[in-house]
Regions:
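Interdomain/boundary linker segments immediately adjacent to catalytic/signaling cores
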Residues: 1-21
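Active-site metal-binding core of divalent-cation-utilizing nuclease and nuclease-like domains
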Residues: 23-74, 82
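Nucleic-acid endonuclease domains
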Residues: 2, 25, 59-60, 93, ...
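Conserved beta3 VAIK motif of the Hanks protein kinase fold
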Residues: 77
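Nucleic-acid nuclease catalytic cores
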Residues: 80-111
Length: 111
């Protein structure tokens, strides 16, 4: 399955979650349900709170970067439940993409 096909599935799930639960819940609620739907309904490999290290001159450095969800090692999903996205949120996903080698990332704000 391509990155774009995975992204369409994720957006559809996010829409359904938001339609049923609405805004205002903690991010972890949306994350848990998203993971559940991807695994149970679509039988996809999902890693939750995936650590993303920095590799510098063959030294692995753990800086605390964690992607909310990685699907099939092809798509990073960063979920938010905040008033509005700030530039730092886009930078966060770009950092994760560059460090992980994953090609596509999505930010979804449930608020």
């Amino acid at each position: 399955m391509s990155e774009n096909e995975l992204a369409k599935i994720v957006v559809s799930i996010a829409y359904n979650i938001h339609s049923r639960l609405g805004p205002g819940l903690f991010e972890s609620v949306y994350e848990t349900i998203m993971e559940h739907e991807l695994i149970i309904k679509y039988h996809l490999h999902v890693t939750r709170q995936y650590p993303i290290p920095v590799i510098w001159k063959e030294t692995k450095m753990e800086l605390g970067f964690r992607a909310d969800l990685i699907v099939e090692n092809k798509l990073i999903i960063e979920l938010k439940s905040i008033e509005s996205l700030a530039p730092v949120h886009y930078k966060q996903v770009l950092t994760y993409l560059k460090l992980s080698g994953v090609k596509l990332g999505i930010i979804i704000n449930f608020n």
